[in-house]
């Protein structure tokens, strides 16, 4: 079933790219030790209790299987048109910086600009401006 899913994901992402969508995929890679620290903070700090689910602790028992599954996903769905960016996430400041840098670089590479306005449209805008400014 997974091979079929991987192909579907790749085809969907290729479709998006062919239709002008930029696909950026980030995996925020938190170490097992850091995850434990964050879970304990969520339990110990009442204002963070809402972030913790008992199932989080149970699922940690399957850490190695999750890591293998993630690796399988990355190997099968990272493509030239929709790559995965695996970002170390133990230090939030670094994670935010790395993700922001990739987004900014991608946006710059698109060479985006505002649409140009034709002379006819510019005249219409000036006329609309006169109408608005003449209101009482």
UniProtKB/Swiss-Prot annotation:
It holds the Pfam family PPK2. Signal peptide: none annotated. Coiled coil: none annotated. SUPFAM superfamilies: P-loop containing nucleoside triphosphate hydrolases. InterPro entries: P-loop_NTPase, PPK2-related. This is Uncharacterized protein in chlN 3'region.
